Amino acid sequence: MILGDFGTSYSKFLDLSAARPEPYIIPSKTLTVENRVTIATGHIGKRFSDRYVNELTVLARGGEQLITENDFVLLDCGSRDIKFIHYIDGRLNDMGWNSECGASMGFTIELLARYYDLDYHVLPVPDRPFSVTCGVLGMSRIFDDVVSGTPDAEAVARFVMGIAINAYRFAGSPTKLYLSGGLCDNPLFVQSFPCQVVPLGRFVLLEGLKAIARKDNNPQDSKALS
């Protein structure tokens, strides 16, 4: 059984039939018909499986597997959108999905690093952010500031911080936030949140799919979707 999280920029897979299942990643632009899976989620997942599960459902199941607290907020930041789930007393309390304020967020952050030849591992957190409503529209603010004399690195750092604060507010401004997605590997983004952040990595949705597959195989397994 192969599970797939099909994102806009990257797709993640887990082959449960392998002797030692390990997740792996490939660029979504290289996907072919050979990449069909048993259960899929993600923006383009319906094209690669007969069984598709909504991303919010999978995110919730992944959070249940990886987070021990009964009360938590889990935010997933992807290439083209952001989504969150909020649990209270071990039960789903709220959720949200936004492709407007999160439009092309992860993609834009990655694109800027390439364009300006920047390393987010060494960029310091700026003293103030840009007011950013979405990734695409925020780029014009960067170019305006660079033309006005702001160093490239500082302008991009303010943009990244603005994106992080916007995502934080979308998730309800929690005091502690669990983070999912490729931006977990971006220290500038993680450190720009005005709260405690616990990065869970980019395979949370695969964990959710694995829990769903386990439940399918053993409906009596209460731990699968507890």
Predicted stretch roles:
Residues 49-90, 168, 207-217:
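Conserved phosphate-binding catalytic cores of ATP/NTP-utilizing and phosphoryl-transfer enzymes
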Residues 43-44, 169-193, 200:
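Glycine-rich phosphate-binding loops at beta-strand->alpha-helix junctions
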Residues 134-176, 198:
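Adenine-nucleotide phosphate-binding core of ATP-dependent small-molecule kinases
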Residues 61-64, 106-109, 197-226:
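Glycine-rich phosphate-binding/hydrolytic loop that grips phosphoryl groups
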Residues 91-134, 201, 207-212:
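Glycine-rich phosphate-binding loop plus the immediately following alpha-helix
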Residues 1-5, 70-76, 178:
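Short glycine-aspartate micro-motif
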Residues 1-61, 191:
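N-terminal glycine/serine-rich phosphate-binding loop of ATP-dependent small-molecule kinases
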